[in-house]
């Protein structure tokens, strides 16, 4: 029996070290050299302090801020999840209708789909350009800015589809909100 057990345990140990230690460390090291900011989580710093990540959404609720998509996990990255409500769910319909009414009351514009539906992860850092533009008036009024200035700031933060082909144009909510704060209003 030991003749079979010893090679099996040696293989288990060797493969565990290779796939559980060496491989992850090698990839982390390569990533740190090739794309150090992305390897560290695409963290955004202000005055030496981490204020968020470009890849993980966070909630903003004040009228002077660009609001993100709804989150099924209440912006908890450790508990990220979708709502798991099906497309025929009465509870989902009620949530969407409630969000739509609130959005339209706050912004005076019809709600784009991404303003009333949570993403699969619940932590999308982006909204559609249409969603961001629809919020410009509310943000401008709350901050005492001209709506055109807020729209220019939003347009400056529109990210195109990857290589112009994949995905959709999008606006990073945290980047816009930090730019609004930096504008001083």
From Swiss-Prot:
Recorded topology in the membrane: Single-pass membrane protein
GO cellular component terms listed in the entry, alphabetical order: plasma membrane
Name used for this protein in its record: Potassium-transporting ATPase KdpC subunit
GO MF annotation terms: ATP binding; P-type potassium transmembrane transporter activity
Self-association state and partner proteins as the record states: The system is composed of three essential subunits: KdpA, KdpB and KdpC.
Spans through the membrane: 14-34
Keyword terms: ATP-binding, Cell inner membrane, Cell membrane, Ion transport, Membrane, Nucleotide-binding, Potassium, Potassium transport, Transmembrane, Transmembrane helix, Transport
Stated role: Part of the high-affinity ATP-driven potassium transport (or Kdp) system, which catalyzes the hydrolysis of ATP coupled with the electrogenic transport of potassium into the cytoplasm. This subunit acts as a catalytic chaperone that increases the ATP-binding affinity of the ATP-hydrolyzing subunit KdpB by the formation of a transient KdpB/KdpC/ATP ternary complex.
Family from the record: Belongs to the KdpC family.
Originating organism: Cereibacter sphaeroides (strain KD131 / KCTC 12085) (Rhodobacter sphaeroides)
Locations listed in the record: Cell inner membrane
